[in-house]
Amino acid sequence: MESNNNEKKKVARQSSSFRLRSPSLNALRLQRIFDLFDKNGDGFITVEELSQALTRLGLNADLSDLKSTVESYIQPGNTGLNFDDFSSLHKTLDDSFFGGACGGGENEDDPSSAAENESDLAEAFKVFDENGDGFISARELQTVLKKLGLPEGGEMERVEKMIVSVDRNQDGRVDFFEFKNMMRTVVIPSS
């Protein structure tokens, strides 16, 4: 039993960027992910759409395993997961892998929370900094946006404008401090 708990903690530490600890950010990000995965915009994510999205992210999942996991969350009569089903699946996965770590709020005054937040930001930065040089170039940003299936990745001019909007020192690329500043100043609409 102790070994199982240690394994969960180890997985949680290695994959801390998966955990979405702030409830308002969690809901916003989860809705955005749902919208990205719902390719035809019908309000449902089919097993096939989920499989395609995971493949684009480099997470090749066995279709039969995915089907057996996901189908139990699909309501009778629906063609796929609606947002509530998707949220339930996410919560179950979070509880299974991370002990429900995404449900709680963040305490900015807590030094360990601040360190985790910094670590999460560093992991997110590495996703975009594909060559590991410490900067996000327009080409790297475009590559990631395309992998995610986002239309913004289709036009380099649009990607360059995104870079310019956060590039405070005007060197044509985003460093980690500019990335952190951008992530911390994202405005989340209140409901």
UniProtKB/Swiss-Prot annotation:
Subunit structure comment from the entry: Interacts with KIC.
GO biological process, one term: trichome branching
SMART domains tied to this protein: EFh
Gene: CML42
GO molecular function: calcium ion binding
Residue span, EF-hand domain: 25-60, 116-151, 154-189
Induction note: By touch.
Summary of the tissues where the protein is detected: Expressed in seedling shoots, roots, rosette leaves and flowers. Expressed in the leaf trichome support cells.
Name of the protein in its database record: Calcium-binding protein CML42
Function (record text): Probable calcium sensor that binds calcium in vitro. Involved in the regulation of trichome branching.
Keyword 4Fe-4S: no
Residues that coordinate or bind Ca(2+) 2: 129, 131, 133, 140
Mutant lacking the gene: phenotype: Trichomes with increased branch number.
Xref: InterPro entries: EF-hand-dom_pair, EF_Hand_1_Ca_BS, EF_hand_dom, EF_hand_pair_protein_CML-like
Residues reported to bind Ca(2+) 3: 167, 169, 171, 173, 178
Keywords from the UniProt entry: Calcium, Metal-binding, Repeat
